[in-house]
Swiss-Prot record:
Region of interest called Important for binding substrate proteins, as start-end residue ranges on this chain: 123-133
Record note on what altering residue 131 to A does: Strongly reduced affinity for substrate proteins
Keyword Disulfide bond tagged: no
PANTHER family on file: SPECKLE-TYPE POZ PROTEIN
GO cellular component: Cul3-RING ubiquitin ligase complex; cytoplasm; nuclear speck; nucleoplasm; nucleus
Pathway annotation from the record: Protein modification; protein ubiquitination
UniProt GO molecular function: identical protein binding; molecular function inhibitor activity; ubiquitin protein ligase binding
Name of the protein in question: Speckle-type POZ protein
GO terms classed as biological process: proteasome-mediated ubiquitin-dependent protein catabolic process; protein polyubiquitination; regulation of proteolysis
Segments for region (Important for homodimerization): 186-217, 297-355
Record annotation: effect of changing residue 133 to A: Strongly reduced affinity for substrate proteins
UniProt miscellaneous comment: Antigen recognized by serum from scleroderma patient.
Lineage: Eukaryota, Metazoa, Chordata, Craniata, Vertebrata
Quaternary state and interactors: Interacts with GLI2 and GLI3. Homodimer and homooligomer. Heterodimer with SPOPL. Each dimer interacts with two CUL3 molecules. Part of cullin-RING-based BCR (BTB-CUL3-RBX1) E3 ubiquitin-protein ligase complexes that contain CUL3 and homodimeric SPOP, or the heterodimer formed by SPOP and SPOPL, plus a target protein, such as MACROH2A1, PDX1/IPF1, BMI1, BRMS1 and DAXX. Interacts with IRF1; this interaction mediates IRF1 proteasomal degradation. Interacts with HNF1A.
Organism: Homo sapiens (Human)
Amino acid sequence: MSRVPSPPPPAEMSSGPVAESWCYTQIKVVKFSYMWTINNFSFCREEMGEVIKSSTFSSGANDKLKWCLRVNPKGLDEESKDYLSLYLLLVSCPKSEVRAKFKFSILNAKGEETKAMESQRAYRFVQGKDWGFKKFIRRDFLLDEANGLLPDDKLTLFCEVSVVQDSVNISGQNTMNMVKVPECRLADELGGLWENSRFTDCCLCVAGQEFQAHKAILAARSPVFSAMFEHEMEESKKNRVEINDVEPEVFKEMMCFIYTGKAPNLDKMADDLLAAADKYALERLKVMCEDALCSNLSVENAAEILILADLHSADQLKTQAVDFINYHASDVLETSGWKSMVVSHPHLVAEAYRSLASAQCPFLGPPRKRLKQS
């Protein structure tokens, strides 16, 4: 649940008159999402009104509101027999009622949201009550392989729920002597030191190019640089560091992050930047690179990204790559990247197969709970 924001200063709310007192009302909304995959969808019983329910879910471990999704594969009634019906059901509720908006969509073979439908307002739910769409999607369109909505005969539904909580009022009075504290510009100011090479005390040599930097900042941000300058190493004695395995453009992006906490060109060089972040123990930059690479996972590059993640101990990226390969196994196994990995990294192939087997055979063990970014 997000923290209630402070109200904007009255002088910034309007260029008009300023009242002596004010009130700011925040209506709290808890948002969460749920993904439900139905394997072997074409084998569902086709009687009209037949119901399939998901397991229950909530916004978190401490949330007492429990929900589930309900599907009628062949419609709810005679009117909707040519459609799939989809509903959000409130299973248990400690209150007399709650209000919530919802959005349903289908994830296609690429994991993209399609055929989205959402409620136009927050509906009133009581325990045992459901709301949804009797005519969510035509069955003939859903079952047509050309539309790519049932890869490997799996129907994957994605649901986003927004639950309306209580409202909170914050009130106060205006004073004539309003003090406005300026925003912190530390990142910009440190970035200026790097860009202008002011007050530098060490030189970093990268592929024949020299960059002036500040030992204190490098040591504070990177345990690797800290070790170089702290001990009686040649880098500490000469205040000069030779860097041979990072390209200059990648190095500059890494230094921008060290000084400012930002990497504006990360998406263009996420793979190389991940390697640099791993070498210099820049954990936050490493996770930022993992996130960017996750966003660009595809059938063509899944094997290469899995190898990269394994090489640099990028655990979150590795998990996402394995899950992606499992979901698109029939396509990924035909790529040149996968065939190369079979020869060069057989242990990763074995890991992917083990994960695929456990996903398809849940009876082999208890269900695993899916539970950071600093």
